[in-house]
Amino acid sequence: MLHTTQIRMVGTGSAFSKKFYNNSALVTFTNGYNLLIDCGHSVPKGLHDADIPLESIDGILITHTHADHIGGLEEVALYNKFVLGGRKIDLLVPNTLVESLWENSLKGGLRYSDTYDDLSLSDYFTVRSLKTFTSGAARTQLEENIAIKLYPTFHVSHMASYAVGLEDRGEDKVFYSSDTIFDEYLIDYALTYSWVFHDCQFFTGGVHASLDELLNYIPEEDQDRVFLMHYGDNMEDFFTKTGRMRFALQGRTYIL
């Protein structure tokens, strides 16, 4: 058993990054449960390069259905089923996304195989539907000492997307924004957690919070608890322009 929660950043890049893998984090809770948040198309390669075997992952949580967050699921599903002998891991999906994740994203590549016909998502994963609300936090108990809170985010019109609050042994430990525009109310929720991992872009406008918006809103005394992620390939140009916030670095493990 670990003494504290750990996060390893498998990828920290934006959807179009070529220097960094798709934004994804492997969370290890104090009871040893390994949860991968999001699995974009480049994440399986990121796991391989970080020497993280799929066998070590207990569950994957999906925050929304853009390809840089779900594009690696087909590979994971097929590898577990046909290389690892049908091993099923947890797939944690917001209840608003379960149907669309399969019908609109994964079904085309996973419905049929050379030995099986008309497969479903539950043939590959132990699907665990997570509660959602239209505002505020919806809490789902995952295991005895682990709970997941989902917060709806504004990312792209007509697409459900969620930030994630991670509770470990009763403590609101980590807030993980995934993808969101700048949202004062969401940041207020985030700052109730011990640590914050927030997406960041280097211009204002579009579908992510900008560095300037975060700098101007988050109090200086709270900025040292904030790590910036989901950034562009020009991240190094802004390395000294983040106030007391820091960039989450790909491959780095954060002991929280």
UniProtKB/Swiss-Prot annotation:
Pfam family, one: Anti-Pycsar_Apyc1
Cofactor, how bound (note): Coordinates 2 Zn(2+) ions. One protomer coordinates the metal ions and the opposing protomer provides the catalytic residues required for cCMP hydrolysis.
Single GO MF descriptor: 3'-tRNA processing endoribonuclease activity
UniProt-annotated binding residues for Zn(2+) 2: 64, 66, 155
Keyword S-adenosyl-L-methionine among UniProt keywords: no
Keyword entries, A-Z: Host-virus interaction, Hydrolase, Inhibition of host innate immune response by virus, Metal-binding, Viral immunoevasion, Zinc
Residues noted as binding Zn(2+) 1 in the record, renumbered to the chain: 68-69, 179, 230
Cofactor: Zn(2+)
The protein, known as: Anti-Pycsar protein Apyc1
GO biological process terms on file: symbiont-mediated suppression of host innate immune response
Renumbered residue ranges of the record's region Beta-lactamase-like: 21-230
Annotated source species: Bacillus phage BSP38
InterPro entries, sorted: Anti-Pycsar_Apyc1, Metallo-B-lactamas, RibonucZ/Hydroxyglut_hydro
Catalytic reaction list: 3',5'-cyclic CMP + H2O = CMP + H(+); 3',5'-cyclic UMP + H2O = UMP + H(+)
Family from the record: Belongs to the anti-Pycsar protein Apyc1 family.
Annotated function: Counteracts the host Pycsar antiviral defense system. Phosphodiesterase that enables metal-dependent hydrolysis of host cyclic nucleotide Pycsar defense signals such as cCMP and cUMP.
Active-site residues (renumbered): 74, 112
Complexes and interactors: Homodimer.
Domain of life: Viruses
